Amino acid sequence: SDVIRYPDSVEEKVVLEKIEELNKDISVSGILVQLPLPKHIDKQKVIEAIDPSKDVDGFHPMNVGNLSSGYESSVPCTPLGCYLLIKKIEPNLSGKKAVVVGRSNLNGKPMTQLLLKENCTVTITHSRTKDLKAECLEADIIVAAVGIPELVKGDWVKKDTIVIDVGINKTDKGIVGDVDFDEVSKNAKALTPVPG
């Protein structure tokens, strides 16, 4: 794989021209644009310039639509990795109650679509959800991807819950996730560490 680096001062036109060149290059099978972009570059315009079949992140509107419609599409790597890990722990997800804490286009929404595809009952929550603890206590699966250090506490998680922590937060203690690992590990069937 090749990495193409530009200074923050790069013109949007230069980035779009490079994407078009890569789209046409049959030796290139995937394109990933590292976000966030400099403020003067229109993120949506850049994402939409990528050929959907080469969109590694799955951010192109066609891929987002295909995923939410249940069609074949590129899936962002973090939700896909979380999904595969959950399936390894619990192969039959049908009928399971899942709570996704976070509604981002990068993690929360794609994760929701993947779990729905497995016939889970999914509740999408976020930092402003009223009584988030009560929502989590109902869950067989919790995916925390909200960007709040150690938000999910031990008394939010019932026994034998699968807990996937996507959060990466810098704190005085160092890097921590969105889940209080020490507390939640007492109840969880499986729990991902951060960092890990």
Descriptions of predicted regions:
Residues S1-L32:
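N-terminal ligand-binding/catalytic initiation module
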Residues K43-H60, V64, K159, I164-G196:
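Rossmann-fold NAD(P)-binding glycine/threonine-rich loop
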Residues L32-P36, V101, V194:
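Short beta-strand segments
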Residues G30-V33, A144, I164-D165:
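Redox-cofactor binding/interface segments in oxidoreductases and associated redox assembly factors
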Residues D8, P76-I162, G174-D182:
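Glycine-rich phosphate/diphosphate-binding loop of Rossmann-like nucleotide-binding domains
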